[in-house]
Amino acid sequence: MKPDRDALDEYFEYDAEEFLVSLALLITEGRTPECSVKGRAESFHCPPAQSRFPGTARHECSDKLAQCRQARRTRSEVTLLWKNNLPIMVEVMLLPDCCYSDEGPSTEGADLNDPAIKQDALLLERWILEPVPRQNGDRFIEEKALLLAVRSFVFFSQLSAWLSVSHGAIPRNILYRISAADVDLQWSFSQTPTEHVFPVPNVSHNVALKVSVQSLPRQAHYPVLTCSIHTNIGLYEKRIQEQELRACQHHGPGEVEYRCPSSSQSLCSKHTWTMAPVSALHVRSGMPPEYTAAIRNVRLCPGTGSKSDQGAPQASVLGFSGTGGEVRSQEASVRTFKSLPVVDSSVSSCQSSRQPVGEPNPLMDSLIQDRQEVIARIAQHLIHCDPSSSRMSELPFNTQESTSLSPKLHPVSQESGCVRRYKEAFSVSFGSPEFGSPGDSREGKVREKSETRPGETCTSHSLYPRQPAGEANPLIGSLLQERQDVIARIAQHLEHIDPAAHIPRPAFSKHDSNSIPSKVFRSSFDDKTLLKKGRENVSVSVSHTEVSLLGDRGDGESLKPSKCLRSFKYSPQEKPLKPEVRTQHQNHPDSITPTARQELLNKAAGLLTSSNTALCKESSLGLVSRLESTSCKLQLKEQEMSHETEKQCLHCNSIDKQICTNTCTEKINDEHSPGSLRHLQCDDSKGIDSKLKVTLLEMPDSLNKNKTNCSSKDSKRSKTCEQSIRVGTENDLSEENEGPGSTVSDRLKTEQEAKRDSGAGKPHSVKHCLSAGERLHSADMLRTTLKHSSVWRKHNFHSLDGTSTRAFHPQTGLPLLSSPVPQRKTQSGCFDLDASLLHLRSLSSKSSRPCLNIDEDPDVHEKPFLSSSAPPITSLSLLGNFEESVLNYRLDPLGIVDGFTAEVGASGTFCPTHLTLPVEVSFYSVSDDNAPSPYMGVITLESLGKRGYRVPPSGTIQVTLFNPNKTVVKMFVVVYDLRGMPANHQTFLRQRTFSVPVKQEMKRSINKENVQHTAQLLRYLIHLRFQSSKSGKIYLHRDVRLLFSRKSMEVDSGAAYELKSYTESPTNPQFSPRC
């Protein structure tokens, strides 16, 4: 039978705003990319798909987390639009990987209003959340059903499929835009979208929610998005390639060197003037900011590309004479722009030849895409993570500086006919014959020497310039120093802030492992390993700007000599770049073979001067000395740690009342501590156990000579512990109050006995001492008599109401905390009342009944004996004092039992989700004769939120209690009806379950009423708290408290019984206002 819709009109499982925010967060954060097999995950802010498992903590937002800040903004935007009765639009878009970082533009800034983003973005989905009038009729769904439907759509969306296939790698630049659903604000789809409309649920008294989504049709392949800037760069690059190709066909190799750059210089100058704004260039250029600053200065130069505008600063800075160096520097600047969108620095030598125009190469496209992703990541982190690097743009930077550095980062791959031309260009741009490769032709070397002035030292643009004293340019020195600092910051940011930069990618070629992230941006290992490698490869220190040359040139042998010969140039500016140098040693340990290294050393011997050799020796000696000092420091630290742990162990072995568990594991040192293998493990017994367990590990054969001494020492310690701690309960407690003075005499006596035992040479003295202590302790326990519970109040067992608990059983001496279920003497199975508790002031009765006089009343011997301060006879079955005291935490528990769980559910006009929650179970001591202790369980509902667990206004609540073995202890079923409960009120229900004998023989009619009450034995109890919200919704809040017996359904043998349940609630008043 379908429930009446009108009866459900006032009750909704979610608030309208809360439900709307849950939908928006599910759309925006339900497929957060992550590096896993699934590729995506729901964030902590999304509504849970299932009930929370036991132990799962509720997420607490923090302002330090960007995702939490974004979720807060989403919540505020959705709430604002909903309060203004405006439809909400959520758009899901993709941005190109080349120009946008992993984080992408945020919705809080003005980036979304940029027309470039609107032009570059690919719209995937458009969600419309629109309030509509309340739906009437039989066809309706609940809010939870709509939430499940939206979750299913998000799970099977196109974006989720891409993330799943790529394991979270692509797409990374996902943009969500939340705004009002206005036609003027909507962005257009690239194709005709498909629309899906979800069923409409009612979310409030007069409003329903209509959710629809328009999505792009399924794509066969992942779209390759390109931005407008890189599209323009590609156009210029294509025209430059065509002109150079024609020049190479019509002119000889010698003429190409001079005519190709000059013919394309005007195009390059035009390109620099027509680039994007400075901010876009800084993000999208794909180069670190020091190189970006150089290009930015090129763009801002007033010159139009003529040789006279650029030649003067080149000649003044580099010291070149003639036009050869000038023309080659212009050629290098052209190559910089040309190599940006085309060539990847990770392309191997066999793939570095140019593809014919018009023939697409998918491998090259994938490599270009990978290169652009790395470039975008570098630029983004330099903007958002290192704002200080942006100041580089304000400094003057010469154009030739960029032309000499750019070929290092972005080497150009040309066809085999132009290889010699590029080798000569590299050697000339470096400005020193030392940088030439062994494969250079003789003509190139003669040209280099003729262009360099004799007796004049040319300034190099590598990272280690060498200038004579007095000729150094302070401007260039400061720029080089800042560039080195920026590169060091790049490596730190990409390692510590952007772990996604190290996602493993499929190898495209055998040299793909030499890509930019693996070559430059890797963090160093520990200093010890680095110093060892630095000592072995002192002569092979690679500068960070030359790493990208690996795998890009066709002649592999020409790379290694140039790489090594450059490393011998030393300057004081080398010091801040040691982390990068070490990093490259680690990432490329096989880049220089021993044979190649020997050849390079032989080659270097003829080229280096004596000063360079002395500097290299000094650097190698410095590395060796640092390695030796580091190793000495490590040894000293290890020795200090071993001595400290040994002192801690000896301190723990000493006899005092603060006995702790020794977890120190000593490092064995054969010379200093041969006997450090002994461990003494003591269990914490300060209020838990009255006996001390001493565990001795066997001694190894190599330490037999110390066996007797160690055993005697251990016997002293163990016997002292046993004599001073394992005594009667009263003595133990009084000993704590009196102080350590009483233990000194015992310690002296036990030491004398231990000396006699050790002098006899018995290796089993420890066991003998332990056994003697146990016999003495058992004899003392047998002589101990039962004490009244009020005696325990003398020994520092403080409680909230004065009723104290015992830590040790008075007869057996066993600790009650280590035995959660004490043994009992009676087999009745009921909660026997401890008569001694009735004498305590906290449990005294306030009844006006007169006290019983034994002498005057002749029938008193036939009635159950009662104390003069006992409560009324109607509460003898623990329905009064014990029940209220335990439920209100007025009794201290003896112990806690872990592992209990409970499944909470409800049914009525709707069925909320069943929850499985942990139960905190504790037990108590109710008598001196070891009667069975009842258990109290508390189910905390605070993890569900401030309101609690939503239940129907009337129906049943079912609570199933499971023990640690996952078997059912009790199933509580409580029927309730709170339809008359007003808003913002609270009440409670308490259900008691008694075991009642079926047949009773009343021997004495005078005690008939009394016997009926005493025969009803309380077996189970459940206490439920209810409250109503402002809208009239009913919640089970705060906690659920249970009382249950230790043994399930165990009563007197042979007695027939039945269980009867009674549910009670307040009557006057039935409901009270919420606090």
Swiss-Prot record:
- What is the name attached to this protein's record? Atos homolog protein A
Localisation per UniProt entry: Nucleus
Region described as Transactivation domain 1 (TAD1): 24-32
CC annotations in GO: nucleus
Domain-level remarks: The protein contains 2 transactivation domains (TAD). Each of these domains may be required for transcriptional activation of a subset of target genes.
Keyword set includes Membrane: no
Q: What keyword terms does UniProt attach to this protein?
A: Nucleus
Where does the record place the region Transactivation domain 2 (TAD2)? 962-970
What does the record give as the function of this protein?
Answer: Transcription regulator that syncronizes transcriptional and translational programs to promote macrophage invasion of tissues.
Q: Which family does it belong to?
A: Belongs to the ATOS family.
Bias type Polar residues, positions: 703-712
Q: Which organism is it from?
A: Mus musculus
Region ranges (Disordered): 430-469, 570-592, 703-766
Q: What InterPro entries does the database record attribute to this sequence?
A: Atos-like_C (IPR033473), Atos-like_cons_dom (IPR025261), ATOS_Transcription_Regulators (IPR051506)
The cross-references to PANTHER family, in alphabetical order and at most eight, read: ATOS HOMOLOG PROTEIN A, GH03947P
Q: Which residue intervals are annotated with compositional bias (Basic and acidic residues) in the record?
A: 440-454, 746-759
